[in-house]
A protein has these predicted regions:
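Conserved phosphate-binding/catalytic region of the ribokinase-like
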Residues: 91-92, 142-242
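Structured loop/turn residues at beta-strand edges in well-structured enzyme cores
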Residues: 62-65, 125, 156
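A non-catalytic, amphipathic alpha-helix used as a structural packing/dimerization or gating element
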Residues: 3, 88, 122, 126, ...
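Short, hinge-like loop/turn segments at secondary-structure boundaries
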Residues: 5-10, 34-37, 116-120, 147-150, ...
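Conserved N-terminal subdomain of the carbohydrate kinase-like
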Residues: 1-74, 99
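Hydrophobic anchor at the start of a short beta-strand
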Residues: 15, 97-99, 161, 178
């Protein structure tokens, strides 16, 4: 964990609540690059990844409760004790505004799709924003069509549903508003990290009080900028670039 802490500080990220698990290695991920749309990932997380070994005792529950924004990935629901830790965090959060679930479904981390659907379904009433692509929405709510998927997420309890559609752009819906945003056209070098940039821009837009349209435009553009670059975390755009 030493490298992770050092890199976070170098990038200006507050790491005071980042827990290390001495018994486990920092996971390593390799990405092959076959532009424009094939970027297979190879994860080295055996025997287990430290993020999946988090317990509720590791969590700064007051900080989670009081945070202006709180983001989880559903990968954390794939295994105990991380699953229970996530439920503890969401319980402390108590559906405070900007409680976000990234529907980031990675089959290799789950027993099967049915298990993933069951566990993701349990947390949707506890979050206010859900973000995923069509495949991830299908796992979460059984709907692949963007309109029906967004509606199903809203029916499950979220206040803002965002469905990423790749080259077809992004659909975002609340109970009173609908935004369709075309993809920002770039020459793709590496798609790895585009989703992270998209999510980061969503967080920035929500915290800045931007309109839904401006927020989704910024997110789409941020993802496109990163996909036009070779790197990932160090390729994230700044607000002036957007």
């Amino acid at each position: 964990g030493r490298f992770v802490h050092t890199e976070m500080r170098r990038l200006g990220v507050d790491d005071r609540h980042v827990v290390t698990k001495a018994a486990y290695n920092t996971p390593v991920t390799f990405c092959e690059i076959f532009p424009p749309d094939d970027f297979p990932l190879y994860f080295y997380r055996e025997p287990s990844a430290p993020d999946l070994e988090l317990t509720w005792e590791d969590l700064p529950l007051e900080a989670i409760r009081d945070a202006s924004i709180f983001w989880i990935s559903v990968t954390g629901l794939s295994k105990e004790p991380s699953r229970s830790a996530h439920h503890a965090a969401l319980g402390a959060r108590d559906r405070r505004r900007f409680t976000i679930a990234d529907l980031d479904y990675r089959p290799m981390f789950w027993k099967d799709e049915e298990t993933a659907h069951r566990e993701v379904s349990k947390i949707l009433p506890k979050v206010t924003v859900a973000i995923g692509n069509r495949e991830e929405c299908e796992v979460a709510v059984g709907e692949r069509d963007p309109e029906r998927a967004a509606d199903a997420l809203l029916e499950a309890g979220v206040e803002l549903a965002i469905v990423k559609q790749g080259r077809e752009g992004t659909l975002a819906k609340t109970r009173t508003e609908r935004v369709e945003m075309p993809v920002t056209s770039v020459t793709t070098k590496n798609g790895l990290g585009a989703g992270d940039a998209f999510g980061g821009a969503i967080c920035h837009g929500l915290l800045s009080g931007w309109s839904l349209e401006k927020t989704i435009f910024a997110a789409s553009t941020a993802g496109a900028i990163v996909s036009s670059r070779l790197e990932c975390s160090t390729a994230m755009p700044t607000e002036p670039e957007l």
